[in-house]
Amino acid sequence: MVAYSPIIATYGNRAEQFLETDSDFAKYHAKLNKKLQHLRSRCHLVTKDTKKYSSKNKYGEINSEDYDNKTKLIGVLILLHAERDLALAETLKLRARQRGKLKKSEEKVLSTRLKKACKTADKLVNVTQNEQQWITRAQYLAFAKLVHSEYLINGKRFKRKDNAKISNNLALVFAALEHLKNLSLLAEEVVDNIVNKYQYSLKQYAGNLITTPEINNFIVERVQSDENKDDELVKLLLDNGFNMKKITTSTEDQKVTTNINWRSFNAKIIDAEVAQFLEQGLSIHPTQITQYTQRLSKLEKALDRHEFFIANHDDQDDIDEMVENSSENNQIILAYIKYNILLTSISRERDLFTHLWNQWLKLNTSLPSKLTKYKEMERIVKNLTKYLSDIMELPGVYSDDELLSQLDLCKLYFQLFLNTGCLSVLYQSKGRYMEALALYVDAYRRLENKLSEIESLDEILLPANLLSLNSVRSLQKRIENGGNSVITLAEYEKRNHGGSLGKYDLTVIEKLDSKKILPTDIQLKNLFPLKPKMLPIPSKPTLFDLAFNYITYDKQEPSASQVKDSVTETESISQTPISNEQTEGEPKKKRGFLGLFGR
């Protein structure tokens, strides 16, 4: 019979879903809500009558007898209640990390939720006290200790933390996880994720532990101490074959030197811890995305240890005797470790990008789903661009023209892959073929210009999963094929766009009675007028006559025809009688318009 694993159901589920940002944990929180609704229904704990709900709440009356006799899902229900509070706490912590600090309201919510999670964890331990499977029971106990440690570290707002309790809980949890991992009852990735999350806290609250042997020995001491002899988790471990031993290290083993040959630089690692962590990290070759955490963890430990070594041992006589230029030697090692950390992060993001690209290829034609996936891939490409920019600024990299050009090409590769593989497809699905063609043309020009700047790609200095000659050629072929596939549609769209409805052109429905309708006129946007249009109208003659009365012209010599007309007009005027009001000395007034504009 396979035992239920609470650790995999919580921390393992987090690792599988790649929860990294606050929005990821918010989505995870929503998923937990749906699971809890389903579990409450299956456990018959739904109270439909909400009047005086506290007296009718079935969840508060759960006890160990219900867990033993009714269903084991009650334990899962309580477990996920605590996990939901932890997910909200992780969301607030990540938001505070981005902002730089917690808001006062967030501090209160964080403390309240972690305190509630502690109460839920205590209830979980109490309800599952008769669990027959020691594997499940041990994980319930370990989960409860992790929740209490989380509350003491981040939830309880005191200047002085309970160092002894925090370090003791974490040590026992680490012992349980290591034992279950050795028995192949827990996946190594899940255990490493938890250890990486809380190892720094263990080092800090246990008295500034530094080396791996020191941490191992502290864990063994906590398990074997008289203080924990009555602890249920310790009893379960000892009864089921726990045999972790202390590690003894000699001073001679700590003076191991390791040579580094990186590009044109040579250096020697003096500190044994740095050499050990670096060797362990570089020996890990991840085949899955979750395994990158192990490699990064080892390399970051090497970085921390080397920075500590520089701060405390720089420019000392014993080191100067072993290395000619110790300061330069230390800086080379520092740059080398940072280079490998960034390169590992880039490889991880590259695998994530490949994973999302495979999901993109399997998507249906639904535009919202493709748009959501595109945004996820765009976020990964931004991370890749940032990591590549950081690695290009490292000492020893920005002065290496060949390596720098290949890193720049790698950055361009991912940007063009996203534009031509995803964004152009989205434009095509919306019928905007000219924009899609513009993306292909721009990608082709940028890639050709970049390749012309690089002398040769015969020797690739980056890992094959990041950049290779085949991948560059494949991208070139994709760009050419994509451009060829859309150029005809773009030309057709351009013609239609060029002959589209003008400002004063009539629509189809306006041409029904008066004008001939051509097949090219029939378009969805040209069937009937959608917006009011301002059309020109002819001016009224009366307005022109009114203006003419007030226009004067320069005197010009009249032509023969004008003289003849004027003579005829004079004769006709002389025949009309002149009123008594007009005198010979008065000038003639121009007639006004309706008697309003006369003078």
UniProtKB/Swiss-Prot annotation:
GO terms for biological process: SRP-dependent cotranslational protein targeting to membrane; SRP-dependent cotranslational protein targeting to membrane, signal sequence recognition. It comes from the Eukaryota. Its main location: cytoplasm. It is found in: Cytoplasm; Nucleus, Nucleolus. GO terms for cellular component: cytoplasm; nuclear periphery; nucleolus; signal recognition particle, endoplasmic reticulum targeting. Belongs to the SRP68 family. Heterodimer with SRP72. SRP68-SRP72 heterodimer formation is stabilized by the presence of 7SL RNA. Component of a fungal signal recognition particle (SRP) complex that consists of a 7SL RNA molecule (scR1) and at least six protein subunits: SRP72, SRP68, SRP54, SEC65, SRP21 and SRP14. This is Signal recognition particle subunit SRP68. The lineage of its organism: Eukaryota, Fungi, Dikarya, Ascomycota, Saccharomycotina. The gene is SRP68.
